[in-house]
Amino acid sequence: MFSGSIVALITPFTPDGEVDYISLKKLVDFHVDAGTDAIVSVGTTGESATLTVEEHVKVVAKTVEFAEGRLPIIAGTGANATHEAVTFSRLLNNTGIAGYLSVTPYYNKPTQEGLFLHYNAIAQETDIPVILYNVPGRTAVDMRPETVARLSEIKNIVALKDATGDLSRVAKHREMCKEGFVLLSGDDATGLEFVKLGGQGVISVTNNIAAADMAKMMHLALDGKFDEAASINQRLMTLHKNLFIESSPIPVKWAAHKMGLIANGDLRLPLTQLSEPARPIVAQALSEACIY
């Protein structure tokens, strides 16, 4: 259902801090033309933490509208209170999305049983496919493979975005989860190896600015042409790493603006513009990747 090169899309803003829907449409068209397989709207990279609930729902709905059915849109969701996560899912149910990407509850550090009950409650409220999202580096909680396996038995929990960077988990998840459960990397630097080990794709930050290369690389990998895919990945590796030289999405927004993909690279506080010392480092990575 979900595979290949999926972009964790940035949310562009105007200089006065409003969502820039003109740039958003431009981004959607850019990804359609580049062969991106799906878009995650308002996930971590889309600055979900600094959008109001109303803005979040509108950005997702407008992204679906701009896509015009040309590629599926996945809505970023999640909260550290289960009732809020359920409410969020209800609000997004009628926007035309193809799925939810639901991050584990953050800060309050639930147990594995708490994680299971949290996602089970979300799944009971919708028929739309749910993608689990494990990113312990941001949430301070790690969803263990055993918990993922339990959740994979729930009908509409269909996939996992694994942003741990731990490649040993691919085999564990493949062995423990039900047949057909989709594994997606959430780590650009290890994404190709993740697919080589049995994953089905990557939800990518790099894809925001190197969409055609990421699509080609993932499609080659899924066809078993790993040597050709590795050649592209090697060219992008410095970019994969340097897009995290400061907190994401700070570097990728700066790069997208530099490339003319968005009207400006503003973020909402507490996120700030890319620092002056980091700018030549990201610029050099763009040059090495041969995309700007």
Swiss-Prot record:
The keyword Nucleus does not apply. SMART domains: DHDPS (SM01130). One of its GO terms (molecular function) is 4-hydroxy-tetrahydrodipicolinate synthase activity. Keywords: Amino-acid biosynthesis, Cytoplasm, Diaminopimelate biosynthesis, Lyase, Lysine biosynthesis, Schiff base. The active site is at Y133 (proton donor/acceptor), K161 (schiff-base intermediate with substrate). The record marks T44, Y107 as: Part of a proton relay during catalysis. Catalyzes the condensation of (S)-aspartate-beta-semialdehyde [(S)-ASA] and pyruvate to 4-hydroxy-tetrahydrodipicolinate (HTPA). This is 4-hydroxy-tetrahydrodipicolinate synthase.
